[in-house]
From Swiss-Prot:
Organism annotation: Shewanella oneidensis (strain ATCC 700550 / JCM 31522 / CIP 106686 / LMG 19005 / NCIMB 14063 / MR-1)
Signal peptide range in chain numbering: none
Reactions this protein catalyses: 7-aminomethyl-7-carbaguanosine(34) in tRNA + S-adenosyl-L-methionine = epoxyqueuosine(34) in tRNA + adenine + L-methionine + 2 H(+)
Pathway(s): tRNA modification; tRNA-queuosine biosynthesis
Protein name: S-adenosylmethionine:tRNA ribosyltransferase-isomerase
SUBUNIT field: Monomer.
Gene: queA
Keyword Nucleotide-binding: no
Role: Transfers and isomerizes the ribose moiety from AdoMet to the 7-aminomethyl group of 7-deazaguanine (preQ1-tRNA) to give epoxyqueuosine (oQ-tRNA).
Amino acid sequence: MRVTDFSFDLPDELIARYPMAQRNASRLLTLDGNTGTLVDKQFTDLLGMINPGDLMVFNNTRVIPARLFGQKASGGKLEILVERMLDDKRILAHVRSSKSPKVDSIIHLDGGYEMKMMARHDALFELQLLSELSILEVLEAVGHMPLPPYIDRPDEDADKERYQTVYNQNPGAVAAPTAGLHFDDAMLEALKAKGVNIAFVTLHVGAGTFQPVRVDNVLEHKMHSEWANVPQDVVDLIARTKAAGNRVVAVGTTSVRSLESAARASAGQLNAFSGDTDIFIYPGYQFQVVDAMVTNFHLPESTLIMLVSAFAGYEHVMAAYQHAIKQKYRFFSYGDAMFVTKKAH
């Protein structure tokens, strides 16, 4: 398959630059992966589509304020975007400046903090914080929310809350698992009251999620790697759910990738998993764990639209996107959602 097979023209006004006033006020497009049937709904209608005994799996990563501003010793301005925290003093990061910082040079951050450039790893820089504080403390003090490049505005105070799920737990993501942004506490409680089981995995979404696919042939794409954790209690819950004939519903592509990574690591048997994953899901992939998913509308030619196409069928997904554009759904991180059921192979 060609990367251009996943292209579509999106009018600029359909890119959501701000979230809805209420988390669950978005629209929801449902797609039946077997028939291709589309239905326009509201996000709150999701409650009626998840059955008692179904298991919903959420990604509880917490977005860190991963964008830092500062200057080199020479005075040149630079911008740092954390890709991942290596430990409590060191990060791997993208650095934007007129000239790349040299090894052993000092970077002066806003707020008076300093970092030392330790090494370069391809496009990423290894930086060490020179402070008694931890990286996380410095990010919380002077970091900015790393809004995606297509939200072309400076971050605002409101983004600290809204570019974050209500159930976030483990700091480390530099992009939000956006399908989860639609859920508020009341909706989670309503799902539980209905007899829906809820479980959490962690995948620290990296900045690589916004990197364009730079090859023509899908098979040649080298996927970035991210850290994921699928605990044993979630594995046990999935086994019980499947044994009872109920569905596993993943909230977001990151939850899908976490669960499928765990299955891949143990040759189709689902075992607990903790470590880096570079799983790349595109049409032809056989899903081992997930039966249905909640997901936002993704960028053209992205690995995420490829994943959804693998799940519900390429023609069905591309037709759904054309429908969404026609019906003026809001796209990307702060946009509307889809509820998609898996196409039988």
